[in-house]
Amino acid sequence: MSSVKIECVGSDRYRLGESPVWDEKENSLLCVDITGRKVCRWDAASGQVQALSVDAPVSSVALRKSGDYVITLGTRFAALKWKEQLVTTIAQVDRDKANNRFNDGKVDPAGRYFAGTMAEEIRPAVLERRQGSLYTLCPDHSVVKHFDQVDISNGLDWSLDHKTFFYIDSLSYSVDAFDYDLQTGKIGNRRSVYKLEKEESIPDGMCIDTEGKLWVACYDGGRVIRLDPETGKRIQTVKLPVDKTTSCCFGGKDYSEMYVTSASDGMDREWLSRQPQAGGVFKITGLGVKGIPPYPFAG
């Protein structure tokens, strides 16, 4: 077992850091600060962070095949031109739910952008239940609604054979699997593959490695856990120096580094003084496994 090393990269501290995505072309890590309403890009070579402010809570960012990015902000799917600092709405959802916003999102192997909604939180993890839905933005810019009654739509990824969709609705304290059809993007036959233990707290963002194992960031659990979706067993736990770990992705050279985002919202002064890196982005090396490159949105 190689020795695991954890370091905080960049000096920025986010209120609700989320949605880390590696941009190989730019040798950079993208992420968002949902409540801080900004999309951030950390340059791995220079260590510099560029931030782009937006007009609503921005909950996920993804690469786009034609260049630049797509984001979810408020209840909108939007295109983001980085250099021009230009945001253009592509589609809107949940028009009948003024208190909703998007949460986590990710692009599937066919280039569709999956993202889910939730009610705006009163305080972290406290909100009106079952207000959210899971959506897909297709490359032709049409939107498909998969299901509703979601509490906090969160982590998502696809199996290496593209036959299973993994998904987290945080307050179910479960990592779920669906049968997934790559051709149509349809999902069905939902089942739980892992139930979180008490000390793991709330499942948040998620990614998959090249061995088909899932990595889940545990909000208020201060850790990422590695799960085997076949056996339903936890294989590994990596603890971080902050409690509010929110999401994870692989990146860097050969996708052998893991990046973990975190939050500081909901922490009082005393808590923050104990965890000065809360809201930071962490790089984990020495895990001995690699991830797969993110898929770009095809539209």
Curated annotation (Swiss-Prot):
Keywords: Ascorbate biosynthesis, Calcium, Cytoplasm, Hydrolase, Metal-binding. The lineage of its organism: Eukaryota, Metazoa, Chordata, Craniata, Vertebrata. It is found in: Cytoplasm. GO terms for biological process: intracellular calcium ion homeostasis; L-ascorbic acid biosynthetic process; positive regulation of ATP-dependent activity; regulation of calcium-mediated signaling. Pfam families: SGL. Belongs to the SMP-30/CGR1 family. It comes from Gallus gallus (Chicken). Its cofactor is Zn(2+); Mn(2+); Ca(2+); Mg(2+). The active site is at D204 (proton donor/acceptor). GO terms for cellular component: cytoplasm; nucleus. A divalent metal cation binds at E18, N154, D204. It comes from the Eukaryota. Gluconolactonase with low activity towards other sugar lactones, including gulonolactone and galactonolactone. Catalyzes a key step in ascorbic acid (vitamin C) biosynthesis. Can also hydrolyze diisopropyl phosphorofluoridate and phenylacetate (in vitro). Calcium-binding protein. Modulates Ca(2+) signaling, and Ca(2+)-dependent cellular processes and enzyme activities. Binds 1 divalent metal cation per subunit. Most active with Zn(2+) and Mn(2+) ions. The physiological cofactor is most likely Ca(2+) or Mg(2+). It catalyses: D-glucono-1,5-lactone + H2O = D-gluconate + H(+). GO terms for molecular function: calcium ion binding; enzyme regulator activity; gluconolactonase activity; zinc ion binding. Pathway: Cofactor biosynthesis; L-ascorbate biosynthesis via UDP-alpha-D-glucuronate pathway; L-ascorbate from UDP-alpha-D-glucuronate: step 3/4. Its EC number is 3.1.1.17. Substrate binds at R101, N103, E121. This is Regucalcin.
